[in-house]
C-alpha cells in the first residue's frame, strides 16, 4: 500500500521540473497527472476479482512488477517524453491492483486468527495510513532528489524501485489469507452465513452512503498537489520543486494525523467522519481560492493541509464502510469499486486547467465548493434517516 501511494505521488512533485526541464505545458502535465486514472480503473476492476479468485499475494506480486516497469518508463521519459504516457498509465494499473488486493489483504490480516486484539475499523485505518505514508514520503523524496541530485528526472524515481523490491520481499513472507474460488484461507474462521446480510444491502448502502463521498477523497489532494503549487510559486524562483515536495508531504501527512479523529468520529455516528471530511474539503477549497487570488504560497500550504485532512477523513470513512458492508468473498471487488470512484478525483486538475481558459482559477476553486456542499447535505440527510445502520 505504501508502494502504491509512493508510485502515484512521486510524479506529482516533479510537475514543476517537467515544466522547466523538458518544457511540458501545464495542460500536458495535468493530462499526464490524470492519465494515471485511465490505468487505475482496469487495475482496480481486474485486480479485485482476481485477488478474490486467485489469492492476494499473486496479484500484489504482479502489481509490484508492473509498478516497477512503469517507474522505469518514467525514468526513460526524461529524454523521450513520449514514454511518460505509458509510464503513467502503467503506474495506474499497478496502483489499482495493489489498492484492491492490498486493502483486502490488510482487512483479513487485521482479523482473527492473524490479529486477535485490534478494534473494529483497524483495517481501514491501517490501509489509509499506509497509503498516506506512501503519498507523503514519495512526493517529498522525489522533490528533494530532483532539487539536488544529478539527472533529477531519472534519479528522483530510484527510491521507488528500491521500495518496490522491499515490498515484494515482505509480501513473500506475509500469510496468504484467501485461496482460489474467493474463499478465505483454511486458517481463517468461517464467514457468517450469507443470509446474515441480505444480498441487496451492501450494494444499496454503498451507492447511497459511500459512492457520493468517494470522488472527494482525491479531489482534495489532487488540487493541493497538482493545481495549487503552480498557481502560487511565481516568487519562489529556483525553489519551486522543493515547495511542491513540501506540499506533497503536508497534504497526505495531515491525512495521517487526523486518523485518531476519524476513529473518534466513527464511534459517535456512522456518517460523522464523512461530514467532517467534506466540511474540511469545503474549507480547504475556500482557502485555496484565497491563496490563488492573492498569490500566497503560505496560504496555499495551509489550504493543502486542510484539504489533506479532508482526504484523510473521507478515505477512513469509505474504507470503514466498505469493510463493514462487503461479504468476505466480495471484499476485494467492493474495495476496487470504492477506489475507482475515489480516483475519479484525480481528473480534477485537468478539468481546472481547461476551465481556467474561461474563468479565473480562484473562481473555479470557489465554484467547486457548491458540489462539495451538496454532497455534504446529501450524506447528512441519508445518514440520519431512521433505519440507516451499518451491518455488524
Language-model region placement:
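Helix-loop-helix hairpin linking two adjacent transmembrane segments in secondary transporters
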Residues: 118, 122, 126-175
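Central cavity-lining transmembrane alpha-helices of secondary-active solute carriers
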Residues: 31-48, 99, 103, 249-261
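A late C-terminal transmembrane helix in Major Facilitator Superfamily
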Residues: 311, 317-364, 368
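Symmetry-related core transmembrane helices of the 12-TM Major Facilitator Superfamily/SLC fold
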Residues: 154-171, 363-383
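Conserved MFS/SLC helix-loop-helix module at the cytosolic interface between two early adjacent transmembrane helices
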Residues: 41-80
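Cytoplasmic helix-loop-helix junction between adjacent transmembrane helices
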Residues: 87-131
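C-terminal transmembrane helical hairpin of 12-TM major facilitator-type secondary transporters
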Residues: 271-316
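Transmembrane alpha-helices of Major Facilitator/SLC transporters
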Residues: 244-267, 277-284
Amino acid at each position: 500500500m505504501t508502494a502504491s501511494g509512493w508510485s502515484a505521488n512521486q510524479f506529482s512533485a516533479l510537475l514543476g521540473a517537467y515544466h522547466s526541464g523538458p518544457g511540458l505545458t501545464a495542460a500536458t502535465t495535468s493530462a499526464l497527472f490524470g492519465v494515471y486514472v485511465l490505468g487505475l480503473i482496469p487495475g482496480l476492476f481486474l485486480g479485485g476479482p482476481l485477488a478474490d479468485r486467485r489469492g492476494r499475494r499473486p496479484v500484489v506480486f504482479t502489481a509490484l512488477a508492473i509498478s516497477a516497469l512503469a517507474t522505469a518508463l518514467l525514468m526513460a521519459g526524461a529524454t523521450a517524453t513520449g514514454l511518460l504516457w505509458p509510464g503513467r498509465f502503467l503506474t495506474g494499473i499497478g496502483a489499482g491492483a495493489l489498492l484492491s488486493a492490498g486493502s483486502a489483504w490488510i482487512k483479513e490480516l487485521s482479523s482473527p486468527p492473524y490479529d486477535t486484539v485490534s478494534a473494529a475499523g483497524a483495517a481501514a485505518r491501517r490501509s489509509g495510513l499506509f497509503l498516506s505514508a506512501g503519498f507523503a514520503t514519495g512526493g517529498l523524496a522525489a522533490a528533494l532528489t530532483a532539487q539536488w541530485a544529478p539527472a533529477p528526472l531519472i534519479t528522483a524515481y530510484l527510491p521507488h524501485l528500491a521500495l518496490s523490491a522491499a515490498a515484494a520481499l515482505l509480501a513473500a513472507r506475509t500469510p496468504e489469507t484467501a485461496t482460489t474460488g474467493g474463499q478465505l484461507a483454511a486458517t481463517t474462521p468461517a464467514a457468517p452465513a450469507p443470509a446474515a446480510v441480505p444480498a441487496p444491502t451492501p450494494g444499496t448502502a454503498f451507492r447511497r452512503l459511500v459512492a457520493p463521498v468517494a470522488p472527494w477523497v482525491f479531489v482534495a489532494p489532487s488540487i493541493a498537489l497538482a493545481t495549487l503549487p503552480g498557481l502560487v510559486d511565481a516568487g519562489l524562483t529556483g525553489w519551486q520543486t522543493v515547495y511542491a515536495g513540501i506540499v506533497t508531504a503536508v497534504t497526505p501527512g495531515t491525512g495521517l494525523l487526523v486518523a485518531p479523529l476519524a476513529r473518534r468520529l466513527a464511534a459517535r455516528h456512522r456518517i460523522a467522519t464523512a461530514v467532517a471530511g467534506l466540511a474540511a474539503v469545503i474549507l480547504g477549497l475556500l482557502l485555496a481560492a484565497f491563496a490563488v487570488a492573492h498569490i500566497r504560497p503560505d496560504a496555499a500550504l495551509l489550504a493543502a493541509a486542510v484539504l489533506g485532512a479532508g482526504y484523510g477523513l473521507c478515505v477512513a470513512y469509505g474504507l470503514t464502510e466498505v469493510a463493514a458492508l462487503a461479504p468476505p468473498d466480495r471484499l476485494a471487488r467492493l474495495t476496487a469499486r470504492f477506489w475507482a470512484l475515489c480516483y475519479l478525483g484525480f481528473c480534477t486538475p485537468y478539468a481546472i486547467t481547461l476551465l481556467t481558459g474561461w474563468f479565473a482559477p480562484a473562481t473555479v476553486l470557489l465554484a467547486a465548493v457548491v458540489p462539495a456542499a451538496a454532497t455534504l447535505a446529501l450524506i447528512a440527510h441519508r445518514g440520519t434517516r431512521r433505519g440507516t445502520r451499518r451491518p455488524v
